[in-house]
């Protein structure tokens, strides 16, 4: 009975495979939104202000960072929790593939979240005159929380690795 239970539990990791595949659909959605933003801005590129162009650029960078985060979670999560990716010797292999353990992945995700939060904060500062001070304070507190959390996770990971 125990052996059957353990085999079933081990096989249940494959439930995550379609979830990781589903993230690729989110990636397609981000790609569509990215190019929608570009096609929206191109016809009016000579009419918009520099500040508006910077805001659009920050939005595009934000989408790109989220896309990179999705790719990292998809591949690393699949490799760490489901099965090793067998992309073949003749195709390009990402240099970090197979090297990110769950601790490294958490640190990279935390760093990405801080970067994404920084971009949102920069967009808010570019429009500071139209945003209430209370909202700005909350945005700053949330960002500082992300930064401190990322720092703490990195420090704990470093301490854990030093103890091995």
Swiss-Prot record:
It comes from Shewanella baltica (strain OS185). It comes from the Bacteria. Its main location: membrane. This is UPF0114 protein Shew185_3725. The keyword Transmembrane helix applies. The chain crosses the membrane at residues 15-35, 53-73, 108-128, 136-156. GO terms for cellular component: plasma membrane. Keywords: Cell membrane, Membrane, Transmembrane, Transmembrane helix. The lineage of its organism: Bacteria, Pseudomonadati, Pseudomonadota, Gammaproteobacteria, Alteromonadales. It is found in: Cell membrane. It is a multi-pass membrane protein. Belongs to the UPF0114 family.
